[in-house]
UniProtKB/Swiss-Prot annotation:
Membrane-traversing stretches: none
Organism listed in the record: Staphylococcus carnosus (strain TM300)
Protein name: Histidine--tRNA ligase
UniProt key word Iron: no
GO BP term, example: histidyl-tRNA aminoacylation
PROSITE patterns per the UniProt record, alphabetical: AA_TRNA_LIGASE_II (PS50862)
Length: 428
């Protein structure tokens, strides 16, 4: 038997209903904030991620699915969404659109060769938001407010917004020098990843998860001491907006994001819930990227965004015992007796469905009792039984499955019966 590739999953019908609910809710929220959907290819030129994400990052070094196509071009399955959206912004000359900033969101599969663990897959579905074309603390605050709004709208609590400023490029240059000076004397005792990062991306050492390295990280210089006046003022304004919005936050000077393109505001949303046995789990992350467009041969424009994993959102809802609203009922199940009635039901189903009525029938030649059981299994709200007598005189009894009440109507009035019910429900 051929099995599913390691690190992937089948999303079966009982789960896909939850996915549709989440995706529909996210779409509704994006309308409130005036963000428009963008769809980019699942694969891109490898150079896009090497340049846009950063050669020294774990994503590029270890996690990308890269291959040569038949034209001998190096192609990579997208490991994240921002670089592709920025590439599209540049290629489609969106900077010429007077409606700046361009507010975009995306939702789709991403691919990273990661170690399998709970809530993480090698093919995962990422929802992300990008606002490109404005460097203003108020839009940073809007993005942070949106992140909180998303998770709160699903009923999640125990949320902790963690923020930091990684400064502009000048600030980071000075800070990187200080980090190298701090870590150089002890770098031989660090893990291999940290040793490799010392001269390429020393800020990433601050994010090391190896216990023996954490002591040296605790005493490392803080970026807040190396921010220039412009970076300090920008971050202070972002925090002032959050205070005005009554959005609580925690500052963490060691918070750095895993990709090279971040500048100024960086953030993560965490959940600190008893349901996680005391563990703090990251739900979402993002930040500002002021040099990415120029790095990809684009205009001197700025952007900010975030991304979240649908899988991890589902896991958080499950861990906190939050049920997802489902409306998967079937309006009508048609029970048939005999071949003539079954043939009639095929035409009747077609007519019902064209009028927006969710309907189904038996396809396994079950007896009446078996068909009624099937109607219950599929959650039918109503059933009708059609046999020779019903076909002859055109009269049917429509039964409400929960109450057992029945109405006698003519077959020709079946569509209007449901349309009238829906009108009455709409008036309530």
């Amino acid at each position: 038997m051929i099995k599913i590739p390691r690190g992937t999953q089948d999303i079966l019908p009982d789960q896909s209903r939850k996915w549709r609910y989440i995706e529909a809710k996210l779409d509704e929220l994006m309308e409130l904030y005036n963000y428009k959907e963008i769809r980019t290819p699942i694969f891109e030129s490898t150079d896009l991620f090497a340049r846009g994400v950063g050669d020294s990052t774990d994503v590029v070094q270890k996690e990308m699915y890269t291959f040569k196509d038949k034209g001998d071009r190096s192609i990579t399955l997208r490991p994240e969404g921002t670089a592709a959206v920025v590439r599209s912004y540049i290629e489609n000359k969106m900077q010429g659109d007077p409606n700046q900033p361009i507010k975009l969101y995306y939702n789709g599969p991403m691919f990273r060769y990661e170690r399998k663990q709970k809530g993480r897959y090698r093919q995962f579905n990422q929802f992300g938001v990008e606002a490109i074309g404005a460097q203003d603390p108020s839009i940073d605050a809007e993005i942070l407010a949106m992140v909180m709004h998303i998770y709160q709208s699903f009923g999640l609590k125990h949320l902790k917004l963690v923020i930091n400023s990684v400064g502009d490029f000048d600030s980071r240059k000075e800070y990187n020098k200080a980090l190298i000076e701090h870590f150089e004397p002890v770098i031989d005792t660090f893990c291999n990843d940290c040793q490799a990062r010392l001269y390429t991306n020393p800020m990433r050492i601050l994010d090391c998860k190896v216990d023996r390295d954490k002591e040296a990280v605790k005493t490392a210089p803080r970026i807040t001491d190396y921010l220039n006046e412009e970076s300090k003022e920008y971050f202070n304004q972002v925090k002032q907006y959050l205070d005005d919005l009554n959005i609580p936050y925690v500052e963490d000077p060691n918070l750095v994001r895993g990709l090279d393109y971040y500048t100024h505001t960086a953030f993560e949303l965490m959940i600190d819930s008893p349901d996680y046995d005391g563990a703090i789990t990251t739900l979402c992350g993002g930040g500002r990227y002021n040099g990415l467009l120029e790095l990809l041969d684009g205009p001197k424009q700025t952007g900010i965004g975030f991304a979240l994993s649908i899988e991890r959102l589902l896991l958080a809802l499950e861990e906190e015992g939050i049920e997802i609203e489902e409306d998967e009922h079937l309006d009508l199940f048609i029970v048939t007796m005999g071949e003539k009635a079954d043939r009639y039901a095929v035409n009747l189903l077609n007519d019902l469905r064209h009028h927006g009525i969710k309907a189904d029938k038996d396809y396994l030649k079950r007896k009446i009792k078996g068909q009624m059981k099937q109607a219950n299994r599929v959650g039918a709200e109503y059933t009708i039984v059609i046999g020779e007598q019903e076909l002859e005189d055109g009269n049917i009894d429509i039964k409400h499955m929960d109450s057992g009440e029945t109405d006698s109507i003519h077959l020709a009035d079946l569509v209007s019966y449901f349309e009238n019910k829906k009108e009455k429900q709409g008036e309530k």
